[in-house]
Amino acid sequence: ETEFDYGTPDGYRFFMDLGAAANAKKYFGDDVPTYTDFMNHGTYDAYWKARNVPQHLKNVKHPVLIVGGWHDAEDFAGVFHMFRGLEKLSPGNDTHMVVGPWDHGGWGRNVGDIFWGIQYGTNTGEDFRSQVELPFFRQHLKDGPPANLPKALMFETGGNKWRRCDAWPPAGSTPTKNLPGAGGNLSIGAPAPASAAGASSAPAYDALPP
């Protein structure tokens, strides 16, 4: 049940018309805990530091399957922070990580063969649920056969294939920086010089439309 009339079915329009963040108080008051927390703690202060989950993952002694998507706009980094926290603070635990070509929660509801026009060749979402998630739960909840999962199962979007890794980052890998350059170019190591007349490397942002 809606507690107040937004005045529009378009949530984006509601917040664009709202104006300053302080104006939201007349709608939300103190009844939305998460919103209140954000307003009361606008920086990474002691309140948020105490609630940073990875630091508390000590002595975990049960199987863990961490799942994320390369296209997750809400909390992509959290997957890797959780995995690193478990590997560091509970190194002997049965921990696995899976990252596929999905958006936020897409591994649980989508076919997974396409994302915004990008074809992946297989039904990655359905394959995950039937070949990874189900065997994992069967093994640990129903004493089924081993799920045979690697430490990290990662989908390579450029090659449209799954990679089984004994560690993450993989042993022998070298971190590189992908840097945006002028004219919409992307380079590895150092940004490419502008080649087109009038090309700009300054990012453009317009809240309306974003």
What are the residue ranges of the model-derived segments?
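Acidic catalytic loop of the alpha/beta-hydrolase fold
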Residues: 71-75
